[in-house]
Regions:
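Amphipathic alpha-helical segments used for helix-helix packing
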Residues: 70, 82-106
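Residues in soluble alpha-helical coiled-coils and helical-bundle/repeat scaffolds
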Residues: 36-40, 44, 62-65, 82-83, ...
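Hydrophobic/aromatic-rich alpha-helical bundle segments in the mid-to-C-terminal region
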Residues: 105-109, 113, 128-174, 181-199
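Helix-turn-helix
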Residues: 2-40, 44
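Recognition helices and adjacent regulatory flanks at domain boundaries
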Residues: 3-4, 18-19, 44, 48-50, ...
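Hydrophobic/aromatic residues within well-ordered alpha-helical segments
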Residues: 38, 45-49, 53, 111-115, ...
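Hydrophobic alpha-helical connector segments
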Residues: 44, 55-88, 140-144, 168, ...
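Solvent-exposed, amphipathic alpha-helical segments
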Residues: 2-10, 56-63, 90, 94, ...
């Protein structure tokens, strides 16, 4: 969507209806007639996000098959909007609006809740298919969402490698202890230290 693409390139202060119109290939008057204000345009763009979450997760399931692979790859793909520090800064600027403006906050809360619910479903499937140990999947879904957000901000500060690689490593690190046979798969140096600590 033209609005979403421009939000990655322009901050809320810099974004104009003319920018979005040019990206969409229409004249600004068309957007002014339809939306009236920039705020209304942004609200319209954001309102579609919560309802699209189940479909997004379903498409990823069909693509990757494995519940855990689906989870990791989908979170990585969804970080594409902030693949540069500049795009991340723009995203954080829009997040400020989401936290202050009640209408935007309601949409953001609904989107976050939908993502957490779909993440839990993937974790439930991962347990059922013996990819994960039995665990509190609701709590793990919460942790995944928190690690995802924290890792993205962490990467924007350290700027080592790509965001995709940084995020994948963070999510896999969180999930590692929950995998079946996790201790057996740990690096030898680490398992050696664990054995020495037991003596």
């Amino acid at each position: 969507m033209a609005t979403t693409r421009m939000m990655q390139r322009r901050s809320p202060v810099d974004l104009t209806l003319a920018d979005v119109a040019k990206e969409a290939g229409v004249v600004p008057a068309t957007l002014i007639q339809r939306f009236g204000t920039k705020r209304s345009l942004l609200l319209a763009a954001c309102r579609t996000a919560p309802g699209g979450v189940p479909e997004q997760f379903g498409a990823a399931r069909a693509k990757y098959g494995s519940p855990l692979k689906t989870l990791i790859e989908l979170y990585v793909e969804c970080s594409g909007f902030a693949s540069t520090p500049e795009a991340m800064a723009n995203g954080l600027a829009y997040l400020q609006i989401d936290l202050i403006d009640p209408e935007f906050h309601a949409i953001t809360l609904a989107q976050f809740t939908a993502i957490r619910d779909e993440t839990k479903k993937l974790l439930d499937d991962a347990v059922a298919s013996d990819e994960l140990k039995p665990c509190d999947t609701a709590d793990l879904a919460r942790l995944i969402q928190q690690v995802n957000g924290g890792a993205m901000l962490d990467w924007a500060v350290y700027r080592k490698g790509s965001l995709a690689a940084w995020l994948r490593r963070s999510l896999e690190g969180l999930l590692a202890p929950y995998r079946l046979g996790a201790e057996a798969d740990l690096p030898k140096a680490r398992t050696g230290r664990m054995q020495n600590n037991r003596r």
